[in-house]
Amino acid sequence: METLRADEISNIIRERIEQYNREVNIVNTGTVLQVGDGIARIHGLDEVMAGELVEFDEGTIGIALNLESNNVGVVLMGDGLMIQEGSSVKATGRIAQIPVSEAYLGRVINALAKPIDGRGEISASESRLIESPAPGIISRRSVYEPLQTGLIAIDSMIPIGRGQRELIIGDRQTGKTAVATDTILNQKGQNVICVYVAIGQKASSVAQVVTTFQEQGAMEYTIVVAETADSPATLQYLAPYTGAALAEYFMYREQHTSIIYDDPSKQAQAYRQMSLLLRRPPGREAYPGDVFYLHSRLLERAAKLNSSLGEGSMTALPIVETQSGDVSAYIPTNVISITDGQIFLSSDLFNAGIRPAINVGISVSRVGSAAQIKAMKQVAGKLKLELAQFAELEAFAQFASDLDKATQNQLARGQRLRELLKQSQSAPLAVEEQIVTIYTGANGYLDPLETGQVKKFLVQLRTYLKTNKPQFQEIISSTKIFTKDAEAILKEVIPEQIELFLLQEQT
């Protein structure tokens, strides 16, 4: 039998003592007092920060929003069905952040940047805070490049620039989402990254939008962030900030981005729900006092960066739904005051068959012609005024029986101008095609045609120019000016095509 040697034992003990690493792990913990309706009240968590992420025993993550003297109010990022009274909670020391990378392009994700399209995980090496400060005054420059939407009514009269914030507002079922999705479709080949944020929408509506993008080949430069109507209020509240963080990632990498929020009024409702459950005092329409700040800090992140930061841009297009045309409600007035203009969609126009149903009279872009190419300014300068005069005259003509010839001519011209602004959904037009269309109407070439023939003729004219006179498109795209040569081509082609069209219609 072997005897134990004392020196060996002492050596082993000495080695073990040397290897001992004294690590003290301090964790800030608390206990659940109450849980329900997506809100948990926690006792403890004395050193938690406002907006800090906390983790519950069973894995649910929450955000500490209310820091009170005797408890902490936490909103849950999940259903929290497994959280029990008395279970422990620990502070993570982190503020809400998401991974970001080029790999997100073409994917559908949720507010936590997790994929929900069933196409596997998304690899990312960097991360960004969901809430980051907006660029300062010195970091920006004024908006000067156009963001073409492909819709004649917008690009000619209510132009949107890269880095602008333009509100799309109107009643339900007036084509607001269609205007936004057409804008995304028109960015194909324009080197613009698009982010579409669906907040509190029907899952079927989001699926329809994604299908449209896939069919038109727009998903390759688009990210869809979706939190549908059945998502927890916390995630609906976070979704727009997640979209903004992804768009910012590309903006600071010297790229142009466009982000659509559909729609911030649903985000405000989710925030109202959270605030009321946290027992914050309600204000107008029961919204909390800081609901303006909710939207202003989101929309202020849209910017056109200066040359030292790489001239990237982020254009925001929030969509707000009104109730029976009431733009004086709380959320619409808030968002109107934050944005640089609004596109107003009218249900009366929509029902009258004028689509997109844009009310040109009360829609405005506060950036104006700075966001247009020179060619468009030259051709469309008087279009808005002519349409406004026509609308006034049309209202007057309803009561007058006998009108003089000049008034009749002006009414006929106005009807044809209104007709050329009509467009089918998912059929955006290139800026060269828009210039041809507006020039044809504004210079009276459409006057011999019946109103019902206008659309058919314009399609024919644009096709003819594209195939037989490609030099017109080259002049506009290279110089961005409506030159005498470009006008000469149109003066030669349009009368010929009108004659040919009228002959075809007679036979």
Curated annotation (Swiss-Prot):
Annotated site, Required for activity, chain positions: 363
| InterPro entries reported for this sequence | ATP_synth_asu-like_sf (IPR023366), ATP_synth_asu_C (IPR000793), ATP_synth_asu_C_sf (IPR038376), ATP_synth_F1_a_nt-bd_dom (IPR033732), ATP_synth_F1_asu (IPR005294), ATPase_a/bsu_AS (IPR020003), ATPase_F1/V1/A1_a/bsu_N (IPR004100), ATPase_F1/V1/A1_a/bsu_N_sf (IPR036121)
- What EC number(s) has UniProt assigned to this enzyme? 7.1.2.2
Question: What membrane topology does this protein have?
Answer: Peripheral membrane protein
Superkingdom assignment = Eukaryota
Annotated catalysed reactions: ATP + H2O + 4 H(+)(in) = ADP + phosphate + 5 H(+)(out)
Intracellular or extracellular location(s): Plastid, Chloroplast thylakoid membrane
Q: What class of enzyme is it?
A: translocase
Q: Which residues form the signal peptide?
A: none
Broad class of the protein's primary localization: plastid
Q: Which UniProt keywords apply?
A: ATP synthesis, ATP-binding, CF(1), Chloroplast, Hydrogen ion transport, Ion transport, Membrane, Nucleotide-binding, Plastid, Thylakoid, Translocase, Transport
Q: Which GO terms describe its cellular component?
A: chloroplast thylakoid membrane; proton-transporting ATP synthase complex
Q: Which residues are involved in binding ATP?
A: 170-177
As recorded in UniProt, coiled-coil segments are none
Q: How does it assemble?
A: F-type ATPases have 2 components, CF(1) - the catalytic core - and CF(0) - the membrane proton channel. CF(1) has five subunits: alpha(3), beta(3), gamma(1), delta(1), epsilon(1). CF(0) has four main subunits: a, b, b' and c.
Similarity comment: family membership: Belongs to the ATPase alpha/beta chains family.
Briefly state the protein's biological role: Produces ATP from ADP in the presence of a proton gradient across the membrane. The alpha chain is a regulatory subunit.
Entry protein name: ATP synthase subunit alpha, chloroplastic
**In which organism is this protein found?**
Piper cenocladum (Ant piper)
Q: What is the gene called?
A: atpA
